[in-house]
Design a protein with these regions (language model features):
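Thiol-based oxidoreductase modules, predominantly thioredoxin-like and allied folds used
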Residues: 270-286, 298-311
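Oxidative protein folding and maturation machinery
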Residues: 24-220, 224-227
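Thiol-/selenol-based redox modules, centered on thioredoxin-like
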Residues: 328-362
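Conserved redox-active cysteine motifs that mediate thiol-disulfide chemistry
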Residues: 237-238, 245-265
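Bacterial Sec-dependent N-terminal signal peptides
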Residues: 1-25, 359
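Alpha/beta-hydrolase fold active-site loops
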Residues: 240-241, 273, 324
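A short beta-strand-turn-helix
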Residues: 222-241, 265
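Short, internal strand/loop/helix patches
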Residues: 290-331
Length: 362
């Protein structure tokens, strides 16, 4: 109990909660108080301590909301309060599965209507946090795209649903590329959205990612290797090609590279498989790249290429928005998976072996 009182005192001092008189503050400042107090609640407490903390914070927030003058700002504060509960108490429920606390949270936010026009009072980030907090707790089986579909069909406000759905679309495309599920959401946007700019953006994303979906011809490229020789993807036609897109400055890439390089020995008898690395360091950082390859003893073991950002379209053609990226191409030069799981992933061997087997059947 002593610990929780110290934590609570810290929050009070930080927010200046010693007084319950907020008459000198404008509505904007009071809204910021409501938002901040929930973000300061730790969730590494036991159930009783957390509930006590939440009750204290809720009491404080109630006083703040009572001090807000405009009706619109009061409603916005209540929505921020709901968001705060979903990401404080809600996070604890999500981690522990505590049914009693979930029921308690449900009672506290039962007034929330996701289709309420009041949600337009929030900015896009707060709307997304409120919706995602709600979905995470009460519709946990929905994927990010499923959530977008739910919003399209159950929330009337274009101001609310357009940015939420487009954000989900972009996020999923960056993680998985163009899939049937993506196609379904774009069709839902065409059907549900009344905003031309939203439909146009969805079409632009389709045009960007569709060419690198499964089964399409992989865009050819030509890059310099570590020995100064120009190498094309098409040079390897008739062989399967597995590519690791990385950079020396990328911690996750450097961490994953040994696993990728180890595939050389694991698949040494697979003569129709080419392992290939492509560095995003850029030709201007060639010396650093070469030094890294030599120091790590990777030089000469597989073809190592480097992007010339001034003339290569590789990053654009393959929709490289983050690295590391792994790309698998079949013997005919068609994309098997342009968002392949990393070699260090626990499911890699199972997935990769199955893909190799399927490609060799053709």
């Amino acid at each position: 109990m002593k610990v929780i009182n110290i934590i609570l005192a810290s929050i009070i001092i930080y927010l200046g909660v010693g007084s319950t008189c907020f008459s000198q503050e404008n509505d904007k400042a009071l809204l910021e108080r409501v938002d901040k107090v929930y973000r300061l609640i730790p969730i590494d407490l036991n159930t009783d301590e957390l509930l006590q903390k939440i009750n204290e914070v809720e009491k404080y927030v109630g006083l703040v909301i009572d001090s807000i003058e405009s009706k619109e700002a009061k409603e916005k504060a209540r929505l921020i309060q709901a968001k705060g509960l979903l990401w404080s108490l809600g996070s604890y429920v999500f981690e522990t599965g505590d049914k009693g606390l979930k029921d308690e949270l449900s009672k506290r936010i039962k007034w929330v209507d996701l289709d309420s026009p009041s949600l337009e009072l929030l900015d896009d980030i707060d709307v997304a946090n409120l919706l995602n907090g709600y979905f995470r707790l009460f519709m946990p089986d929905l994927s990010e795209l499923d959530r977008a579909t739910y919003v399209l069909y159950n929330i009337k406000s274009e101001k609310i649903r357009n940015p939420y759905v487009l954000t989900a679309l972009v996020s999923t495309l960056k993680q998985n590329g163009y899939t049937d599920a993506i196609q379904g959401v774009i069709e839902d946007i065409e059907l549900c959205s009344k905003t031309e700019s939203t439909i146009q953006k969805a079409h632009e994303l389709k045009a960007q990612y569709y060419p690198v979906r499964v089964g399409e011809m992989a865009p050819d490229f030509e890059m310099e290797d570590e020995f100064g020789k120009m190498v094309k993807l098409s040079d390897f036609r008739g062989k399967m090609v597995f590519i690791d897109v990385w950079a020396t400055w990328c911690g996750g890439c450097v961490e994953g590279l040994p696993y990728f390089m180890a595939l050389r020995d694991q698949y040494k008898d697979q003569k129709d498989l080419v392992l290939l690395t492509i560095s995003d360091d850029g030709i201007e950082a060639k010396s650093r790249w070469l030094k890294f390859l030599k120091e790590k003893k990777y030089s000469g073991k597989v073809p190592h290429l480097i992007i010339n950002k001034e003339k290569d379209n590789f990053t654009k053609d393959y929709c490289i928005t983050g690295i590391p990226r792994y790309i698998l191409i079949d013997k005919e030069g068609k994309i098997v998976n342009a968002w392949h799981v990393a070699a260090k992933h626990e499911l890699f061997s199972w997935a990769f072996n199955m893909e190799l087997e399927n490609m060799n059947r053709k």
